[in-house]
């Protein structure tokens, strides 16, 4: 191995090597250890439908930061990885591939052959996903990797289904469901995305059967009129009291339907009368149930009109809409049209408009399951970070309807329901029955449908640990500690995991839900294929390194909020890594002799604190304070604040200050002091690497390998940073007096540098400083005087007692506890300043003249908006004040030049 880090920071030189070292040495493996506390995160399983996107990179980085943090704290930290079969999404992809490569439909292949190709897809893309996770630095326990359709998960799914069925919580019924005509399957309510779109309301007259005027009804879906079975009005709506109980005629169709009274219609909306089509609207379905109305379907599962639509049979629903409205208009039934913004439900996968349809499907009764999940949040057993997402969680549970869990697909967990083909007996069993439980026939057929993907994902936190078996992993690692997830799948996944866990294990699946936002592009738009603004994390890693990407993501996001992906933030993160690299090279170089052996260092454990210089105590106290802050913010999931504090500590305090101060000692003649300086450098650098490791694991581990090793640890025989111990805050490492002294000196240095920059004076130009201190501060400044002079290039510091003693013609700056004055004669190049001020005067005179000209123009003052006129008046005042100051300054400088 080389004796020092490479001269140039290039993550490609070591990131893959470091990851292979970790994995081959079992650094990610979590043991069931009664002497340690467990910490568990289950990875939200990415779909096997392609490669990871930037949202996955964020999600996984946050989880890895927490896992590495807890591992360093001494927990047996398990991050359990896996992937999701993603029933609809994967089937769509596989069907598309078969069409393109084989020119076939899935029905041409048959179920068995199709599933072979789906499993081939899983092998291909599942492997790609795990490779991408490894590139990111995910410290998952790959020995426990799971898949939502592996044998263990399938066993858990069947067990859960049968358990709910036998409790009466799963049933099969003919109910209204969401149907995607494109995917050819039912969808749960959570899988329907609602979006407001510009639409139309058509107002049609339904004539009274007795020859009266009847009633006018507004609808946004006239094509469903063929399925109308009633007109509903509110019982308190006086306009329609005489119509209730009578019949009206369905226009052009001629069928009579009743007018009924029901609380559903809103008298203030439309005409107050609502057409009731139970087979094609969920609200109408509920009305139909209350009034025992017939369910008439006029649209088939391919979104085409059926025989109930008469001459429109076979037409697409939207083609029918146009033709039907045209015919109604020509027949005189269309009263008016009205443009409206209408909420439209779309399939979350293909974005086809969903059709409410009556269908025989499997459902989960949700009322009983939802109650414990609601109580878990209200009692504090389950907390959300940030807290506001608890309202979202509770709202969804309190408004929940029965969950449609059957899907008309082939890829997924097949429903464990079996039908006797001879007597029709239904059997729900964990394993396929050999014969009918009623008639003994062996002619048995399994239900063709598969389960909703989220049914198996709902069991993920405990099925992955061996449930329903009482495994050692389940006993030790469950319940898990935190679920890290985006706010976009609280409905889909989080809620279902909670009620499933409470029903099966009696415990919440995790104690905390850390909710993060989305990664948007630089303009704040959601990343998508259609916009072409998606960013491949692997390309970013190739260009900047995984550490830079991870640090940018963790420090750029706050819980629950979206973040914008900006290249300059990546550049900043990479620059930070480069700064740490170069500082570490300097430290390592000064630890070694000419032969590459480590020089002697003081033993800080037994060292008399008197041997430490003030700057040593200051940096040790700063690391100690940072340890406390970073630990506390990490525990609260404020990862951005923790990462930023690590950045400030390393860049601003260690690199910019401590290293610069300590250089003189390292190059000096006092050998004992050198030993102390080396020891402090090593201690501080090691502690900072520990603090930064969860965020930037690769660079910190690489630097760690070049530093002196401590005593061998049974838990970490090879001395890897990933298995080290997290720093612990100690009151003994607080040095308030020395910290005050150094920080006062640093503030003074920064103020002098700012004065130099303002005066355009070179750093090499020696200056004198006059300081007016606040009460009790002069001794502090004097004690730190030796730290000020060299970095600020100050030859002399003098102290004054009051403002009356301030020299004439100075530039000044204020810092906490003191005011600093630099004589103009020291800092100013009067010839250059004279030239600058003359130019500034000329420019300001021009601005004053321009504004005065505008304001003296009566046409401008009378015609321009009052706001614009006031703005110009304000500009005149500002420019005149600036000109007066420049003229005063010019007079002083002119005297100096003369």
Features from the language model and the residues they span:
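Secondary-structure transition/capping motifs at alpha-helix termini
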Residues: 68-76, 97-107, 111, 131, ...
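Feature 926 captures the class I aminoacyl-tRNA synthetase adenylation module centered on the KMSKS loop
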Residues: 203, 395-455, 459, 503-546, ...
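Structured ligand/cofactor/substrate-binding pocket environments in proteins
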Residues: 55-67, 74, 83-84, 153-156, ...
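Glycine- and acidic
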Residues: 1-5, 44-52, 111-115, 140-147, ...
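N-terminal, positively charged nucleic-acid-binding surface of large information/translation enzymes
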Residues: 1-236, 260, 277-290, 294-309, ...
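Active-site-adjacent bridging/hinge elements
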Residues: 35-43, 65, 101-105, 130-137, ...
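Short acidic-hydrophobic surface loop/beta-edge motif
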Residues: 202-209, 246-251, 345-349, 418, ...
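Short Cys/His-rich metal-coordination motifs, predominantly Zn2+-binding knuckles/fingers
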Residues: 183, 253, 350, 421-423, ...
């Amino acid at each position: 191995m080389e004796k020092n880090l490479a001269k140039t920071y290039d993550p490609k030189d070591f990131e893959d090597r470091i990851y292979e070292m970790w994995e081959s040495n079992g650094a990610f493996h979590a043991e069931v250890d009664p002497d340690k506390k467990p910490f568990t995160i289950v990875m939200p399983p990415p779909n096997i439908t392609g490669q990871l996107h930037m949202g996955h990179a964020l999600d996984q980085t946050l989880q890895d930061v927490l896992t590495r943090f807890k591992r360093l704290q001494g927990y047996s930290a398990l991050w359990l990885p896996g992937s999701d079969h993603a029933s609809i999404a994967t089937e769509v992809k596989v069907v598309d591939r078969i069409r393109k490569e084989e020119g076939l439909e899935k029905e041409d292949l048959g179920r068995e052959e199709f599933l072979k190709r789906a499993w081939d897809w899983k092998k291909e893309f599942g492997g790609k996903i795990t490779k991408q996770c490894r590139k990111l630095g995910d410290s998952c326990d790959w020995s426990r990797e799971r898949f939502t359709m592996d044998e263990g998960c399938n066993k858990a799914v069947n067990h859960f289904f049968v358990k709910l069925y036998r409790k009466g919580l799963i049933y099969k019924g003919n109910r209204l469901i969401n149907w995607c005509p494109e995917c050819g399957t039912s969808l749960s309510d959570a899988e329907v995305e609602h979006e407001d779109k510009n639409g139309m309301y058509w107002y049609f007259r339904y004539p009274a059967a007795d020859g009266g005027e009847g009633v006018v009804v507004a609808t946004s879906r006239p094509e469903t009129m063929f399925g109308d079975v009633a007109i509903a009005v509110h019982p308190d709506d006086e306009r329609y009291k005489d119509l209730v109980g009578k019949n009206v005629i369905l226009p052009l169709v001629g069928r009579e339907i009743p007018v009924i009274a029901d609380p559903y219609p809103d008298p203030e909306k439309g005409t107050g009368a609502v057409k009731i089509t139970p087979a094609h609207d969920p609200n109408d379905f509920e009305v139909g149930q209350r009034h025992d109305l017939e369910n008439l379907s006029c649209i088939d599962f391919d979104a085409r009109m059926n025989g109930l639509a008469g001459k429109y049979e076979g037409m697409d629903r939207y083609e029918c809409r146009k033709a039907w409205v045209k015919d109604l208009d020509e027949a005189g039934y269309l009263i008016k049209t009205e443009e409206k913004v209408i909420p439209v439900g779309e399939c979350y996968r293909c974005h086809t408009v969903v059709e409410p349809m009556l269908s025989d499907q499997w459902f989960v009764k949700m009322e009983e399951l939802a109650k414990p999940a609601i109580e878990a949040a209200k009692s504090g057993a389950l907390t959300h970070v940030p807290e506001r997402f608890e309202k979202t969680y509770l709202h969804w549970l309190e408004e929940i309807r029965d969950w449609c869990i059957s899907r008309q697909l082939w890829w997924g967990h097949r429903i464990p329901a079996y039908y006797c083909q001879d007597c029709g007996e239904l059997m729900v069993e964990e394993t396929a029955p050999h014969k009918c439980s009623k008639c003994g026939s062996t002619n048995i057929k399994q239900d063709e449908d598969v389960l909703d993907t989220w049914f198996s994902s709902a069991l993920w936190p405990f099925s992955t640990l061996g449930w329903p078996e009482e495994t050692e992993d389940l006993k030790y690692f469950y319940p898990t500690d935190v679920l890290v997830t985006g706010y976009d799948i609280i409905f889909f996944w989080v809620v279902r995991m909670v009620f499933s866990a409470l029903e099966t294990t009696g415990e919440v699946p995790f104690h905390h839900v850390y909710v993060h936002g989305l990664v948007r592009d630089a303009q704040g738009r959601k990343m998508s294929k259609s916009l072409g603004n998606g960013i491949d994390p692997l390309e970013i890693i190739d260009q900047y390194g995984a550490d830079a990407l991870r640090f940018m993501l963790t420090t750029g996001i706050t819980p629950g909020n979206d973040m914008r992906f900006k290249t300059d933030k990546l550049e900043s993160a990479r620059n930070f890594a480069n700064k740490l690299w170069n500082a570490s090279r300097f430290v390592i170089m000064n630890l070694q002799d000419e032969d590459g052996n480590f020089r002697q260092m003081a033993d800080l454990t037994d060292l008399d604190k008197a041997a430490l210089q003030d700057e040593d105590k200051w940096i040790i106290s700063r690391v100690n304070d940072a340890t406390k802050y970073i630990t506390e913010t990490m525990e609260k999931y404020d990862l951005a604040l923790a990462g930023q504090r690590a950045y400030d500590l390393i860049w601003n305090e260690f690199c910019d200050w401590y290293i610069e101060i300590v250089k003189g000692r390292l190059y000096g003649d006092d050998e004992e002091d050198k030993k102390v300086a080396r020891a402090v450098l090593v201690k501080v650098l090691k502690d900072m690497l520990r603090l930064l490791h969860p965020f930037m694991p690769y660079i910190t581990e690489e630097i760690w390998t070049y530093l002196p090793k401590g005593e061998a640890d049974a838990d970490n025989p090879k001395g890897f940073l990933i298995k080290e111990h997290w720093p612990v805050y100690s009151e003994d490492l607080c040095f308030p007096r020395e910290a005050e002294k150094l920080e006062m000196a640093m503030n003074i240095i920064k103020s002098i540098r700012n004065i130099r920059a303002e005066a355009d004076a070179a750093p090499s130009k020696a200056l004198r400083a006059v300081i007016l201190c606040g009460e009790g501060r002069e001794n502090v400044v004097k004690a730190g005087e030796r730290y000020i002079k060299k970095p600020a290039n100050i030859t002399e510091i003098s102290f004054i007692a009051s403002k009356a003693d301030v020299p004439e013609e100075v530039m000044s700056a204020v810092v906490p506890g003191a005011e600093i004055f630099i004589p103009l004669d020291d800092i100013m190049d009067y010839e250059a300043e004279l030239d600058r001020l003359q130019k500034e005067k000329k420019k300001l005179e021009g601005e004053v003249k321009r504004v005065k000209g505008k304001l003296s123009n009566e046409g401008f003052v009378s015609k321009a908006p009052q706001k614009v006129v006031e703005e110009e008046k304000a500009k005149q005042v500002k420019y005149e004040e600036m000109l007066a100051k420049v003229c005063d300054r010019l007079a002083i400088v002119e005297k100096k030049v003369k």
